[in-house]
Amino acid sequence: MEYNSKDAEEETEDEEEGLKEAEGEEQEKEEVTATSETDDDQEDLPSVLVPTVNIREERLINLAETPAFLCLHELHSKGKLPGTRMAELKAKYTLLHDTVVSTQESEVQLLENAKRFTEQIQQQQVCLQQAEDFPNVFTTEVCKLREQLLKYQNEYTAAQEREYNIQYRLTSLTEEKSIILKEFEKIPKPGEIEKKTRLLKESTEELRKEVIQRRLEIKNLREDVVLKQKQLVREQKELEELMEYQVGLKDDVVHHQSVPVQITKEIEKMTRKKVETEKKNIVLESELKELSDSLKKLENKVNTLAEERDDIMKEVEGKRTLLEVKEREYGQLLKLLELTKENEASSLAERGILDINLRNCLIDKQNYHDELSRKQREKERDFRNLKKTELLLKVSLDALTQAQAMNQRLLLEMEAIPKEYLTLPERRKELHKEVDLARRNLAQQKSLSEAEAKLVEQQIAQENKLLKEQESLRELVFNLGRMTQIKIDEKEQKAKDFLKAQRRYSEIVKEIKSKDLEIRLYKKRKHEIHRRLREFASLYDTIRNERNKFVNLLHKAHQKVNEIKERLKMSLNELEILRNSAVSQERKLQNAMLKHSNNVTIKESIQNDVCKITAKLQEMKEKKEAQLTSMDRLASMITVIEEEMVQLRKKYEKAVQRRNESGVQLIEREEEVCIFYEKVNVQEKIKLHQDVEIHILEEKIRFLKLRIAEKQRQISVTRKLVPIKKSLDADLAVIQIQFSQCTDRIKDLEKLFVNPDSKGRVRFIKGKDLTEEEMIKKLDMLELQIAKKEEKLLEKDFIYEQVSQLTNRLKGKTQACKKDTLLLAKKMNSYQQKIKVVTQEMMALVAELSMKQALTIELQKEVREKEEFIFSCSARIEKGLPLNREIEKDWLKVLRDEEMYAFATAEMSREYMETDYRQLPNGVYTTAEQRPNAYMPEADTELPLPKPYGAMAPFKPSEPGANRRHIRKPVVKPIEI
């Protein structure tokens, strides 16, 4: 949609430029029509203003090929716009298009009606004008001067409006510059960010080192434990081998104990081996001694090993506890590491945002620098042009003074010349009259001969011929002088027109260049804005995805916590219901016992009365029977109550078991809740970071809103600048009517032009055709002019090449110097920032020092006052006088404050208890009366127990209002259990 808005803005700008061009063309055409009014009057053709209004036919447009539909399809194909949104936008666009078509049709109809009515009005106005302007049809010089005055006034007002617009643009640009500078100052400095990142890196490195050290210690302890276990296993194996060897030796001993019996039986056979056996016995005895010694040593060793094993087990347990502690610390450190990682990620994201902002600011700075340099260049160029124009003005003023002096001199000379040329025609006429008289006299003379008369007649005829030739030549000379004057005037006019055209051409070229520069600048800005928008869109997508993840996790955690709270509340409600039911049953049992004791006392009193009273024996018997029946019933009720008590005891035991189980579950859930709270804290920290980022984005949105407000303010100013909207609308309607009339007139003229039978189709141009010689001369002159212009162009090309080479060299030098200036500027900025930071720190330290000094002075004053107060109190006590009334008041105030604090704490605890009591199961607090959540069922045989209503508890209906008293009340349905 942003692209669409930008396209719409560009289209509106193009339309405004088109309207301006149309207005300029209308003015030119008005001038042309004003100049060509005389020709039109001669030809008796109706003249109509032809406005250049470009009305697009919306009915003939294919909606699928419009840029809006194409842009929507592109966005849908890229995945930026969903299908439903695209369909909605298409439907809106089609509706708007239909409304535009209908408005165009109605406008065409209205234009046709207006055209018809305007034609009638024009006809009537022509008739009225012909009637009114009968005596003074011709235009006077006063009217022309009035027209010129109005034209110059309009030009002056247009220049004033242009100047006001330029000043307004300057003010708006200065305001934008100040806003941008404020935002640039708000951006955090890179030095602070680097400090923060450095501190975070140092802390993370220290934590990493500690973690590595702890891991190494844990690893060494585990290796020691493994070595001790291996040593124990090895020693156990050696002990088992020694035990087996001992058993074997015992068997040998037993075997050898039976040998002497065999020896006694076989003395004769073993006489030879006696010595050997004795030797063997000696050896075996020595070995036995050694074995017994070794056994003792082994036993001692086993005891020592068992002691060592106990010590090692104790050490292992201690190490295990230490290991558990270290593992907990390790877990905490891991959590801290995760938090630091998350903080690092958030700081990296912030750093990315700041880098983007910094890059954008640098680009904006470069753009503003370029614009400033361009403005300076334009200023210098305008300054040069101004100097040139001033010089030209001086030259023209000097020339004007010279021309005025020449004019005065010529006027004086003309006055000095004698005015004989004025009397020449009169003298010529007089001489002609005298000559005619002489001729007549000669003709009347009769003394002349015929030959002389003929000669006289011939001379008279020759004289007449010569006079006629003289008159014709005089006329020719006069005509030639007049023609030369006309030609000179035409030449001067053409030269003036040529100079005007040249000036206009140069102005148009300058305007085109400036417009091209502006177009390039706007294109650069557009590309830069698109790039920034893409970066911000990617950042926004990442932030939105992370936020959605965290929000989902939060929702899950909240749901689990709410479920656990609801279960806990349900179990507590059940417990309260059971407790209430047990209390009510105990009360009923006590009442029954009281009734039973009362019945027993009544029975005893009745028996006493039976002994005393004999008259009422029958009645007492009946009463006795009734009492017996009631006793039976009460006994049965007691048995039922006892059974119910047994059942209640069982239920109570079950409830206790459930409570214990729920307590265990609650402990587990509390642990889970603690874990969730830790996660929630982590999520809250992340949320805080996200809130900071959102705050930054909101600041940007606020800045954009400010820009929108500025644009709206500009629009309102432009609307205020154009207060004659209604008159303009009326002019537009008139122009549209004239446009339709012009189209009709053009069609008629085209028909006349195409018609071959019309007489006025061909119009011969007045004047003489040139001869071949004159044409050849003219061509030679034109060729010479072309050759001269080509020479000048070649010279200019050569100069341009040399200047371009010089400028390229200068460009290279300037670019090399730019890098040096950039480095110097960066260093200067860094030093300035350091100086600012140091000065700020110094100022802060000075301020802290001054605050501390002020505090010390105040404390010293208080100490002096307290010492004086203590001294005065001790003096009064030594004298035996009571203390001041102020001390008593202070003590009473302290006591009153303590009482008020105790009362406030009690009130707070009471309110807290009330709020806990008023909290509903869904977590909402209420001050309304609690609805009953259980009811007592009706029962004749046994005591009823309260039963909960469940989810759909009944409510107490309010009294119907005055507007519902005529409606019948609803029938209350019985509760089915």
From Swiss-Prot:
Superkingdom of this protein's organism: Eukaryota
Instruction: Provide the effect of residue 232 to R.
Output: Abolishes interaction with Ccdc42
Regions of biased composition (Acidic residues) lie at: 8-29
GO biological process, alphabetically ordered = cell morphogenesis; cell population proliferation; cilium organization; flagellated sperm motility; gene expression; manchette assembly; nucleus organization; single fertilization
Q: Quick one: where's region Disordered?
A: 1-48
State how changing residue 547 to D affects the protein, per the record.
Abolishes interaction with Ccdc38
The annotated consequence of gene deletion is: Knockout mice are viable and do not show any overt phenotype. Males are infertile. They exhibit normal mounting behaviors and produce coital plugs but fail to produce offspring after mating with wild-type adult females. Significantly reduced sperm count and motility with spermatozoa displaying morphological abnormalities including short, coiled or absent flagella, abnormally long manchettes and abnormal sperm heads. Abnormal organization of outer dense fibers and axonemes with mislocalization of Odf2.
**A single GO cellular-component term on record:** centrosome
Q: Where in the cell is it found?
A: Cytoplasm, Cytoskeleton, Microtubule organizing center, Centrosome, Centriole; Cell projection, Cilium, Flagellum; Cytoplasm, Cytoskeleton, Flagellum axoneme; Cytoplasm, Cytoskeleton, Cilium basal body
- The protein's predominant localisation is cytoplasm
Molecular-function GO term, any one: protein-containing complex binding
Q: In which tissues is it expressed?
A: Widely expressed. Expressed at high levels in testis (at protein level).
Keyword presence, Membrane: no
Q: Which UniProt keywords apply?
A: Cell projection, Cilium, Coiled coil, Cytoplasm, Cytoskeleton, Differentiation, Flagellum, Spermatogenesis
- Coiled-coil region(s): 204-238, 267-343, 631-658, 693-722
How does the record describe its quaternary structure? Interacts with CCDC38 and CCDC42. Interacts with intraflagellar transport proteins ITF20 and IFT88.
Q: What does this protein do?
A: Essential for sperm flagellum biogenesis and male fertility.
Q: What is the recorded name of this protein?
A: Coiled-coil domain-containing protein 146
